[in-house]
């Protein structure tokens, strides 16, 4: 089973509830949130602490230092190996997350085009000249679908997408397989809810992150090299707090960081919705209208119908 959908819809809690309900069958959770791969990035990614995981094994959490680069290809290999091992043990893998390319690469066994250092270097020079915002806008003109899935602040993935487009002469998404039967016959459950309801959840979520110590978490990670990280430093919340600290770290700068984090998360949710809604295999559930037990019933009903 895969549980996907926009940020803030309750995917992690549903995964825990489903795993508990499966009981004797055994279930293990495989993370598909790119920023939860990083050790120490806990508050800003809403990562479940160990004591909240109900004794259920979790995979692909805390596997990278913040100075390491997260790549879809590395994740695909590692997560697929985890899933194969879980299945071999007779248990049920539950993939959970909202990182669009990570999920598609895993469920559709995406093959990644080769890279060309000269082409990559040319786009990196262009990045240095015009900045990531202009480069992302260029990607949006060439391949709107790829731009929708890549954060406007994500220089590395923007460069990679433009490199693939130049090398293949096709949109970046064209290197993905056609949507067919998902790998491992995975049942894909989508969680979403009314925009007004989700906006309120995101506002509370953002406030909670700052109140629970996001600024202190970022400060500690800066001492471990966060600023040098190609992908970790650009994560929502972390990038905004870094900018606020660089500007003096006063109350006004941190207030702006909080507002920018909320606004950036809402924009990211729109991209997630656009991406996931194109996948006809997703069985959507209303996280705002259904009680947790009903969500579990619906998810397991869909899974049992297929399995």
Curated annotation (Swiss-Prot):
The family classification in the record reads: Belongs to the IPP transferase family.
- Encoding gene (name): miaA
Instruction: Share what the entry says about its subunit structure, partners included.
Output: Monomer.
Group of enzyme by EC: transferase
- Check the record and name the InterPro entries matching this protein: Dimethylallyltransferase (IPR039657), IPT (IPR018022), P-loop_NTPase (IPR027417)
Gene Ontology BP term (one): tRNA modification
User: One GO MF term, please?
Assistant: ATP binding
Q: Report the catalytic activity.
A: adenosine(37) in tRNA + dimethylallyl diphosphate = N(6)-dimethylallyladenosine(37) in tRNA + diphosphate
Query: EC number(s) for this protein?
Result: 2.5.1.75
> Which residues are involved in binding substrate?
7-12
Q: What does this protein do?
A: Catalyzes the transfer of a dimethylallyl group onto the adenine at position 37 in tRNAs that read codons beginning with uridine, leading to the formation of N6-(dimethylallyl)adenosine (i(6)A).
Site described as Interaction with substrate tRNA, located at 99, 120
Q: Could you identify this protein by its name? A: tRNA dimethylallyltransferase
Listed HAMAP family? IPP_trans
